[in-house]
Amino acid sequence: MIVLKGASALSPFRLARFESRLQTTVPELHIVGAWHCYLIQIKSGHTLDMSALHRILQAESVSEPPQEHVVSRYVMPRLGTHSPWSSKTTELLHGAGQPIARIERGTRIDLLGWSANAATCPAIAKQLYDPMTQSLLESEDEVKTLFNVPEPLSLERIALIDLEHANTRWGLALTADEIDYLRTRYTELNRVPSDVELMMFAQANSEHCRHKIFNATWTINDKEQQHSLFQMIKHTHQHTPQYTLSAYADNAAVIEGHPTARYRPDPITGEYRHEAVLPGAFQIKVETHNHPTAIAPFPGASTGAGGEIRDEGATGRGGKPKAGLSGFSVSHLRIPTLPHPWETPRALNPRMASALDIMLEGPLGSAAFNNEFGRPNLLGYFRSFELSASKTLTRAYDKPIMLAGGLGAIDRIHIKKLRLQPGDVIIVLGGPAMLIGLGGGAASSVTSGTSTEALDFASVQRDNPEMQRRCQEVIDHCVALGTNNPIRSFHDVGAGGLSNAIPELLHDSEVGGVIDLAKIPSDDPSLSPLELWCNESQERYVLGISAAHLQAFAAICTRERCPFAAVGVATATEQLIVGYGVTLPAALHVTEQQTPQRANHTETSPTPNTLPPSVREAFAIDLPMDVLFGKAPKMHRNTAHPPPPHWPTLDSTQLDLHHAGLRVLAHPTVAAKNFLVTIGDRSIGGLTAREQMIGPWQLPLADCAITLAGFGTYAGEAFAIGERAPLALLNSAAAARMAVGEAITNLCAAPVESLSMVKLSANWMAAAEHPGEDALLYDAVKAIGIELCPALDISIPVGKDSLSMQSRWQADGATHTCISPVSLVISAFTPVADARRQLTPLLHHQTNSELWLIALDGGKQRLGGSVLAQVHADSAALPTFGGECPDLDTPETLRAFFALMNDARNAGLLLAYHDRSDGGAFAALCEMAFASHLGLDITCDNRTEHLFPHLFNEELGAIVQVADEHRTAFTDLVEQHGLTAYTQRIAHPTTAPSIRIMHNDQCLAQWTWETLFDAWWSVTHAMQRLRDNPECADEEREIARTFTAPGLKPTLSFDPAVDVAMPFIATGIRPTVAILREQGINGHIEMALCFERAGFHCVDIHMNDLITGRVHLDEFVGLAACGGFSYGDVLGAGRGWATSILERTALRDQFAAFFTRTDRFALGVCNGCQMLSQLKSMIPGAEHWPRFVRNRSEQFEARTALLEVIQSPSIFLSGMAGSRLPVAVAHGEGYAMFDTPADQAAAHVALRYINGHGQAATHYPLNPNGSPNGITGLTTTDGRITILMPHPERTPRTINLSWSPNEWGEDTPWLRLFRNARAWVG
C-alpha cells in the first residue's frame, strides 16, 4: 500500500470560497492547503516503477506531517465503494505497464484552528464532505483502510412468515397483495425464497419498472372508470399509428424519418464510407431520474442521462444516440446572494439535497455524462416552483424532476429484436459490478424520507461515461455489419441491475436461462450473491448472441477495450437458474483477457432437469419465469377527487408595472439559462442544426432543437418541450393540455410538415399516495389521451411515470410534507424536410417590421398560476396563486395556428418567431430584444386596467416578426385561417436601448435595455459566481449587458468558394489519413468526413491497432488526432493518451518517426491537441508548445467563439491569415500554459480568440479558457503539425453553426483548413 501526495486540489478562488463557508460556522478556522492524495494498491508479487508512477501522477512519495496546530482531514471516496476516477485511472496505469491492483484519489485538507467544537459540528462536516459519496477520515492510517475487503455476506433464505420484515429491512416496497402472492407461489414450489429472489422480484415488479399504477383499474368518486392510464395513452397510437415504427415494445419508440445515407467506417476494413440512401428512422426516449438526483445530485443526474442514452443504444438490435435534452423542476433556489421576496423561509428535508445544491450540481452531472459520452444536449427546461399550502404542507419539488431524453439513429433492419434461441449466449457488456445503486428501482418508488438513510445511500449510483462510450463503439461496429449483426436482442442495465435486465431479455423471447454468478465481472470480491445480481452498476448492457458469433464479438470488444463476459445461456425451459454451481458449455469459453473470472466448463448444455437437487438447492435463484412476469396481483385504485383549490386571486390593479416586469424577469423559471447551457457540448457529432444559442450575441433562446439526418442532407429531426405543471394546482386536465400545446407552439419554430408526424413522449409525475392526487392524475391523462391528442392526430408512443413525488420529515416537533403538483413534461419529436427553414427569436435589424401576437386564448387572458402571481406571493397570507386557469379551450384553434405558421413560413412572411409561455408576452418580447440588441415599443391597444393580463398572461401563443411590406399578405393569411380575432400587433423594434409600454401614444412604463437585462441575467450571474470562477461570471455579465457590444463579426481574407484541393481531387488519387482515436474519443466521424470532403481516403485507427501491430503509421500520409475524453481525462486532458504512447517504447518510436518525416502531416483537435502537446519533445519544431490545463472558469465551456487566423507556417491555415471566423468550442482544459515567457514568445501561434473589434480576447467568455493573448492554436516551425482546441471539423456547413452571416453559402470557410492539407500533399 502506497500513499502519494499530489498537486493542489483547489484553485485559490475555490480555496477562499471553501474557507469562507467554514468560517460562517467556526470563524477561527483557516485552511492551510488542500492537496490530492493517491492511495495505491500493488498487485501481489509485483513491484512498481516509482519514478514512472511519480511522473504519470505528478505526485511525490514524501507526505510531510502537518505543521504545529494544523489538523489534517482526508476526504476519500466512501468506504466500500469504487470511484469512477479509480476505474479510469487503473486502466490508464495498466496501459502504461504499471502493475497496480487499484488506485484511489482523495483530498487532504490541512486546517488551522480546529477544535472540539469544529470536530462535532454537523455544519462543518457538511461543508467538508458529502456522506452519500465520500468518507471523512482523520489519519493516513484510516485512509489505508479504504481498500479493506470485508467478508461477503452469505446467501440468505427467508421464511415465508418473515416476508413483511424483509420488505422493511431491504426497502422492497412490496404491497400486501404482492407479499401474499409470493407466499402462495413459494408454497406451491414447496420452498422458501432466497434474499436474491426477493430483491429481484421487488426490483422487477417495482412501480418504477412495472408501472402498476398506470396499468391499474380505477374507481373514482365511486364510479368505475372505463380505461387504465396506459390504455388511454395507447389510445393515441391506435388513433394515429402513422409514422410510428415501434411503440411500447422496446427501450424507446421508433418513428419514421427522412431517407438518408449513413457515414461510418466499414466494420471489416475500417475505411470510412458513405452508404446507400435508405428510408430513415429515429428512436425517441425521455426518462426521469428524480430520487437519485434528490439524494446525490451530480451522480444522480449523470446516471439519469447515461441510462437514457443506453435506452437509445439498446433499442432494437442497436441504435446510435444522436442528441439529448434535459430538464429540472426544483423548489425555491434561495440563492444566498440573490434573495427574492417571494422565497419565504421554511423547514427543509435534511435527508435531501436543497434546490440550490441540486441546480449547482445536477446540471453539471447531466452535462458531464453527455459531454464525455459524446452526445450534444440541445434542449432543456428549468422550473423553480414552491407554494405554501399550510405550515406543514408545501406544494413544491423538494423531490425534484430530473428529465433526461433524446433521439438517436437506427437502421430499419435493426428496429425489431430477434428471439433468442436455446443455447444462445447471454453477454454482460460494460463495466464491472460494484456495490452501487442497490435497490434503486424500489427506492425511487416510495415517498422520500420514509426509508432509512442507509437505503438512501444504497440507491446512490456512480457514472463512467467513458466506459459507456466504449460500449457504444461495440454496438456501432455490430450495427455496421448490417445483416451480419451478431446482436439478436439486448437491454440496457438500469433499475434493478442484472436482476431486471437478464430476466427481461429472456422473457421477451419466452425462454429461460442458466447464469453463472462467477462469470459476472466484479471489482468487489466482497459482494454477496444478492449484491452481485441486483446492484445497479452503470454503463452495462445484457445481450443475446449466437454461440457461433462469440469469438467475432470478442474481437470487437477487445479492439475497443470494452469489458464483456459470457455469463450464461438461454434454455428452452422457462426457468431462471442463477448460482455458483452451474455448468456452462465449452463454447462459451473466451480468452482470459475478456473473462477474468472463469468457471470450469463442460460440453453439457444445461437444463433445469439435468441438474441434481443438491446442486439446485445451493442456487441463489431457481424460479419459473412466470413467478416474475406471470400473474402478480393487478392493482385497483379506489379514490376520489380532492376538494377544489381555493388559492387567493392576484389583484393586478394594485401592482406597479415597473417593478412587476423586473420581478417576472428575475424569476428563475423565466430568467436567463446560460448557466445551464454553456456547460454542455452542443456541437459534438457534427449533426446539430439548431441548438439553444441564437444570434451574434449567443443567448439560449431557441424554442426547439433540430438535428440533421445525415452529413449530406438538410432533412432531419426537430424536438421541443412543453411543461406547465404548476397549473395542475388549479386544474390538472388544463395543465396537461397546456403542456401539449406549449410543446407544439415551441415546435412550430421548426418546419414541421404535419401534426400527425409529431410524436410525443409523456413523462408523468405525481404524489399518487397523497389523497386525491391520483384522481387528478387520471383527469390529466384522460384530457390528452382520450381527448386532445386524438383530436390533433398526435400520438404518444413512449413515456415514463414517477408517482412518488413527495417527501416527508420531522422538524420543530411536527411532520412536514412536500408534494409536487401533478406534473406532465411533454417532449415532442418530428421529422423535418429542410432544417434551413427554421425560425428563431432573433429579430432582423435591417427591416422595417412589426411584432404580432397570435394569442390562442381568444382574449381570455387568464392569470391563474402565472409567474406574475408567483412573484407576488410574498405576503404572510396564503399565496396569491389562484384565478382562472389558462387552458387550450379548443383543439381546432391550435390546428389553425399550426397551419397558419406553416403557410406563413412557406410564403416567406416570417422573420422571427418566439412562443409565449412563462412570463407571458412581456417576457417573450424582452427575450427577443435581448437576443437582437434592439429596443422595443410594446403597444397596448386595450384598456389600461387590462394591462397586466395582456402583458403577463401565459396562455398559449406566439410572437412573430413580419416586415411592413408583408403586413397585408400576413393579415390576409391570418383571416383565411380564422385567427383574426386572436391576432394583434404588439410591438415594433427600435434601435434605442430601451423597452417602453405604450398606450395611445402615452408611455406607461419604460426601462433601459440594460436594466431589464440585468434582472433577466441575475440568476445566471449568481449561480455562476457560486459554482465557477466569480471573476469570469462578472466579466461575462459585463459583456452580455452591454447594448453596444458587437457580438460575433466574421470577416474573410479569402474566397471560400475557391476549392484549392479540387485540382488534386480531380486526379482520382486519395491519400490515406489515419483518423486516430483512443478509448473515450468521440469526435472521429465528423473529423473523417471533413478530410474525406477535402479529397482524402480516411481509415478508422484505434490505438489498439497500433499497439498490436495490425497497422503502422508508415501506411498514412496524415494523422488526425480527434476530440473527446481519452481515459475520461482523469489525469489531465490528453495526458492518459499521451502516456499510453510515451510509456511504450515501440509506440513512442513509431510516432517519433512519423513526426520526423517531412512528407507527413498531423492535426490535433481538442483532446488530440492536448495529447500532441504532451508529445512535443518528439515533434520537430514544437519545443515551445504549451500544455493545456483547466479553463480559467474551472468549468467545461461550450461556446461559439470568434477566432482570428494568425499568419503562421501552418499548412492547414495557408492563405487564411487575417480571417475572423466563428467556431465551435467545447472543452474543460484549454488554457495554454507555457513553461516560460520565452516559450510563449517563440511559439508559432496559428489561432487566437478575438473580440468583435478584432482585438485579442482577454475577457471571458470571448476567451473561453483564459489563455494568454487568446492563444488557442499552434503549429510547428515547418507547419506540418498543427494543434488547436476549437472544433472546425464540427462546422463544415453553415447549417452546423448556431449563427452565421446570411451571405455565407452552404459550406463554411473552415473547409479550407482541410482542403489546404490536400493541396499540400499534392
From Swiss-Prot:
Pfam families: AIRS_C, FGAR-AT_linker, FGAR-AT_N, FGAR-AT_PurM_N-like, GATase_5
Catalysis performed (reactions): N(2)-formyl-N(1)-(5-phospho-beta-D-ribosyl)glycinamide + L-glutamine + ATP + H2O = 2-formamido-N(1)-(5-O-phospho-beta-D-ribosyl)acetamidine + L-glutamate + ADP + phosphate + H(+)
UniProt-listed GO biological process terms: 'de novo' IMP biosynthetic process
A GO cellular component entry from the record: cytoplasm
Region named Disordered: 593-613
SUPFAM superfamilies to which the protein is assigned, alphabetical: Class I glutamine amidotransferase-like (SSF52317), FGAM synthase PurL, linker domain (SSF109736), PurM C-terminal domain-like (SSF56042), PurM N-terminal domain-like (SSF55326), PurS-like (SSF82697)
Cystine pairs: none
Pathway: Purine metabolism; IMP biosynthesis via de novo pathway; 5-amino-1-(5-phospho-D-ribosyl)imidazole from N(2)-formyl-N(1)-(5-phospho-D-ribosyl)glycinamide: step 1/2
Biased amino acid composition, Polar residues: 593-608
Keyword Nucleotide-binding: yes
Binding site for ATP: 300-311, 702, 917
Catalytic site positions: 1166 (nucleophile), 1287, 1289
Single GO MF descriptor: metal ion binding
Family stated for the protein in its record: In the N-terminal section; belongs to the FGAMS family.
Subunit composition and interactions: Monomer.
HAMAP family: PurL_1
Function: Phosphoribosylformylglycinamidine synthase involved in the purines biosynthetic pathway. Catalyzes the ATP-dependent conversion of formylglycinamide ribonucleotide (FGAR) and glutamine to yield formylglycinamidine ribonucleotide (FGAM) and glutamate.
Protein name in the entry: Phosphoribosylformylglycinamidine synthase
Organism: Xylella fastidiosa (strain 9a5c)
Gene: purL
